[in-house]
């Protein structure tokens, strides 16, 4: 009888072990394959055993823990959405060489860590450079960027540009707009010199819907922030936005969970300029969206989807690009009348 009890106990334990492995394989095996994505993890790398997790937490560095949190705690809210965006908008192709542009803020730091992890486990090869431009940061701000890069184990390349000095000498206009335009040009140039064919920026879901509303309410036009676009000044270069589907609240949560402190706006012009048009307008859009969500919780996703479902037949006027002339609905209207 005693031997029988031992055999039954062993059988029960083996059964539990088999069930646990099946659960782990369902949870971690070929993560995001539902989207047909070229990324996979195996159950052996992600034990859900509590003791194993505790032991692993003691052995992992802060950078490794931050990376691991992407495919555990933030798997649904950040990782799967990044993978979905890369797949849906065809952002990354085999043998790409991508410069992840790091400003020091929460968005670009998260993007860099995501791209680092993705490169390790992608089913096809691509290369990543981690590019930091110093436009004239104060020593404490630059040190914070370098410290976060060390913590997250990101092999950054830092290059300097005179942007802050140039913008400081320009009178009139928007310093923020000029700075942003110059930044992108310098980033394209440096990335191209490194042999990259793409730069990756940290714009996210909230940036997209806020930009859409800003264009309507302040620009008197309907346009949005695209998930990728070709450079008009640097031949063969593209810009991609892998965080296109990731929400800002989840990015903030990831940073707090990993005890990270990121650079806020490091521009010295914020201290002496009373009103920054874009920052002010963007804050208004955030408040407007939050107010509308009190009455309709799907407002943000509906704004986002509206730009994926534009019906030109109902537009009074439209252009097919920045260089195109303005077309009127009357062009087609009068043609139908002649028919």
Where are these regions (language model features)?
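Catalytic subdomain that performs nucleotidyl-dependent activation
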Residues: 127-128, 207-288
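Short histidine/acidic/glycine/proline-rich micro-motifs that form metal-
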Residues: 8, 132-139, 268-275
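Short, Lys/Arg-enriched N-terminal segments with co-localized hydrophobic residues
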Residues: 30-55
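ATP-dependent adenylation/nucleotidyltransferase module used to activate substrates
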Residues: 55-214, 218-222, 226, 249-257, ...
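The feature marks non-catalytic terminal segments
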Residues: 260-339
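Nucleotidyltransferase catalytic core that binds NTPs
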Residues: 1-34, 38
